[in-house]
């Protein structure tokens, strides 16, 4: 079993991010402060989501718990594919779980269509967000004590949809105001 601290994961993501941005800047021979700030928002979304998805929410000895990489004995115990089956009765605090899973992904629905031109419709933004959350859910199969749940996929994608609706409604309102 391998244990990873939040700081180690944060450092790894940061190094990958910086290297990627440098390579892209060198290849394109261009640098835009505005674009880098936009992409920094994407980075912040990823890091915050990694914090709450990969690491237990409660502290252990005043520290964020480590992420344990490995496999459970029976993978079937780690996967729920029945919508809303465990949502309410799995644990106390299920209301907070619903709110947190939705709220955590609202920024993705807001930031991604602003940063990525190809996400020019609500549908494309929601599909990209659903793909992102699916990757997160599948990745959790490699972590001890974590599980993959279709409820999380539904709730996270709902958060993306709410964020996307906010952005696209603002854009529609701006177009109407500019045409007056």
What are these regions (language model features)?
Residues 1-145, 150, 164-180:
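Bulky hydrophobic segments
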């Amino acid at each position: 079993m391998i244990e990873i601290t939040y700081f180690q994961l944060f450092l790894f993501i940061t190094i990958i991010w910086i290297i990627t941005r440098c390579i892209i800047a060198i290849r394109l021979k261009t640098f835009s402060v505005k674009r880098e700030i936009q992409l920094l928002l994407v980075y912040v979304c990823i890091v915050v989501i990694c914090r709450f998805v990969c690491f237990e929410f409660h502290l252990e000895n005043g520290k964020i718990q480590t992420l344990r990489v490995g496999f459970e004995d029976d993978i079937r115990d780690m996967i729920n594919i029945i919508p809303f089956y465990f949502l309410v009765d799995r644990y106390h605090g299920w209301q907070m779980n619903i709110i947190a899973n939705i709220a955590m992904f609202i920024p993705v629905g807001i930031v991604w269509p602003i940063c990525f031109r190809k996400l020019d419709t609500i549908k494309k933004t929601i599909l990209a967000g659903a793909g992102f959350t699916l990757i997160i859910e599948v990745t959790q199969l490699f972590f001890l004590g974590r599980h993959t749940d279709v409820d999380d996929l539904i709730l996270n994608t709902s958060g993306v949809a709410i964020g996307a609706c906010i952005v696209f409604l603002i854009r529609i309102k701006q177009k109407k105001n500019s045409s007056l």
